[in-house]
Regions:
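N-terminal secretory signal peptides that target proteins for export/translocation
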Residues: 1-12
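C-terminal regions of mature proteins
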Residues: 563-594
Length: 595
């Protein structure tokens, strides 16, 4: 898509230097956009297919070096080894050379060029590759003059000055052994703004939009586009990097590949805009939003959207010591719809076989008679064991699915009630597991256990290492677990008992990042680190036994996992689905729990 290796090289170098060195900046005071200086997005047309915008990056990164997660990152053995290696030495030598050339520290120079505002715009073309223009607003009026002079010093160019709309711009072509080579590069300096592109028409468009007189008949600028405004408004204001994409502009590109076009275009036509952003708050947080048409949507998707909007209190009943927890809002119709995605004969045969097996287990059809009783909430947790026992797994898991299992009127058609169907099917699976285990281990047979607690019935197998598989049926939930204690704890948990919702780290992440998202996944990496530290020796022995490895090598692997989890205390992934829009957020953070 980008034709010139030279242009690619300069963009990569500039972006890399900006992202790597800006966290090291100190208090350089940047100039602000004055009233007569245009926004960069006002200098490009609304026909762009992709726009990457970085605003006031220096302010966003100002506090990063003093944050806890960045301090931990610098203290990681991996980072220290890199700092002691040859690549870092080369980087330092190159930085020192550039510092001598530009006459000031490189980090200050990069901040001067890119710390305020940068825009990279890509415009699809009906013939040929897309056109690209890069714009950046520097802190000082002479910044770009020094950059262009340095560029000419490092690489010989033939420079031709041209003019349009009362302003001059340059056509630059690389010279090698006295001969010009490579594609043209066009640059124009507008005060503190520099625009660079391989396409002369894109530079002319920038010049035309910067002219003081209105341009009759010219297409709207990007900042006037309703789609762009709505897409950017869907992102948090704190985003340092923002991306906008217009699906309509890329349809011709998709059609160039007939195979992809046939699969993607029906869905692509429904997309109206896409936006994404990166936020540096508590850590690194990414956001994305997709807006789509609401007409002609399938009924299962509409039910899924409705299910996503229903409230849930599941986090108030999940254990506080979970290292991994999540919840999804699922409409039963969506599960049924999945069967129709693959229309091949093999897929149809497989589904028919699956239906016969489940009907034999449950005494009723899974999709027609069981799933319609499911409620939207489906969640689960992974909880570490303390202490780790030699013959049991180091973690336990619990899966919770909300079901309407209240007793209905007595059936007269001979078909079992839903609760009886689920109980019979799950009990059969437990019995199969017990028979398989006992046939190989007659000395320590697995034994079925049953416990009744009010409206809850729990059944599990003892002596089936490394777990004690269990299921529970209550009036509102179907529960599956690796240990019956998790089912009992879920059933018995009261409002005053410790729960995930009130765990300080989860509460901070939830309130700051995912409160409006009904689908979420949460990793308590701080608890995982503590578990790996406390149970390091028994974990090493256990994993070494299972994987038939030497304990020292397993110990080193666990140390690397713990190191990987060091910078951030939590990670999360969440989605919010509303009519016409889907939003995602994901991040790794170390929140200050004192705030």
């Amino acid at each position: 898509m980008i034709r010139s290796p030279s242009f690619r090289r300069y963009i990569v170098r500039w972006m890399f230097a900006m992202l790597v060195t800006c966290p090291l900046l100190s208090g350089l005071c940047l100039a602000r956009v004055s009233a007569d200086e245009p926004e960069l997005t006002s200098l490009i047309g609304e026909d762009v297919g992709l726009c990457v915008e970085i605003r006031d990056l220096r302010s966003h990164l100002r506090d990063v070096p003093s944050t806890e997660w960045f301090r931990r990152l610098r203290e990681m053995p991996l980072v220290k080894r890199w700092q002691q290696g040859p690549e870092f030495a080369k980087w330092q030598a190159g930085q020192a050379t550039l510092t001598l050339l530009i006459g000031q520290p490189l980090d200050q120079f990069v901040s001067e060029l890119f710390g305020e505002s940068v825009v990279l715009a890509v415009s699809p073309s009906k013939s040929g590759p897309p056109g690209i223009v890069l714009l950046s607003r520097a802190a000082k009026d002479d910044s770009w003059d020094r950059v262009l002079a340095l560029w000419d010093q490092l690489e010989a160019h033939e420079v031709q000055t041209k003019s349009a709309f009362g302003r001059s711009f340059q056509r630059r072509q690389k010279k090698t052994n006295g001969e010009t080579s490579g594609p043209d590069l066009f640059t124009v300096k507008l005060g503190r703004i520099l625009a660079i592109s391989e396409r002369e028409e894109l530079i002319l468009d920038v010049l035309a939009r910067s002219a003081s007189a209105p341009n009759e008949g010219r297409a709207k600028s990007l900042d006037q586009s309703p789609a762009y405004r709505h897409a950017i408004a869907a992102l948090p204001e704190q985003c340092a990097v923002r991306v906008f994409a217009d699906p309509r502009r890329w349809e011709e590109e998709l059609r160039k590949d007939p195979a992809s076009a046939e699969r993607l275009l029906p869905l692509w036509h429904k997309l109206e805009w896409f936006s994404a952003g990166v936020e540096l708050r508590d850590g690194i947080v990414g956001h994305a939003a997709v807006h789509h048409e609401t007409s002609g949507l399938s009924a299962p998707w509409q039910r899924f959207v409705e299910a996503s909007a229903t409230p849930s209190d599941l986090a108030t009943r999940l254990p506080a010591d979970a290292v991994l927890a999540g919840e999804a809002r699922i409409a039963p119709e969506l599960l049924n719809w999945l069967r129709t995605l693959d229309e091949s004969e093999k897929a149809k045969t497989d589904w028919q076989t699956f239906g016969k097996v489940t009907r034999g287990l449950l005494g009723r059809d899974l999709f027609d008679d069981v799933l319609p009783h499911a409620r939207p909430s489906l969640g689960g947790v992974v909880v570490p064991k303390r202490p780790v026992e030699e013959q049991s797994a180091p973690v336990d898991g619990l899966l919770v699915w909300q079901f309407d299992l209240s007793h209905g009127p007595t059936r007269t058609d001979g078909q079992p009630e839903l609760r009886e169907s689920l109980d019979g099917g799950l009990l059969t699976l437990l019995n199969f597991a017990a028979v398989a285990h006992n046939s190989r281990n007659p000395v320590a047979p697995a034994t079925l256990r049953v416990e009744h607690r009010d409206t809850l019935t729990i059944k599990w197998l003892d002596s089936l290492p490394p777990y004690r598989p269990a299921f529970g049926l209550g009036s509102e939930h179907l529960l599956l677990a690796t240990d019956p204690r998790l089912i009992s704890a879920f059933h018995d948990r009261k409002a005053a008992d410790p729960a995930l919702k009130s765990e300080p780290l989860f509460a901070a992440v939830h309130s700051r990042h995912i409160a409006e998202h009904s689908h979420w996944l949460f990793l308590n990496s701080r608890a995982a680190r503590e578990f790996l530290t406390e149970q390091h020796e028994p974990l090493s022995r256990q994993v070494a036994h299972w994987r038939k490895l030497a304990p020292p090598s397993v110990s080193a692997q666990l140390d690397r996992v713990r190191e990987f989890l060091t910078p951030f205390d939590a990670a999360f992934l969440a989605a919010r689905i509303t009519p016409g829009e889907v939003r995602f957020t994901a991040g790794a953070v170390t929140p200050d729990l004192r705030k």
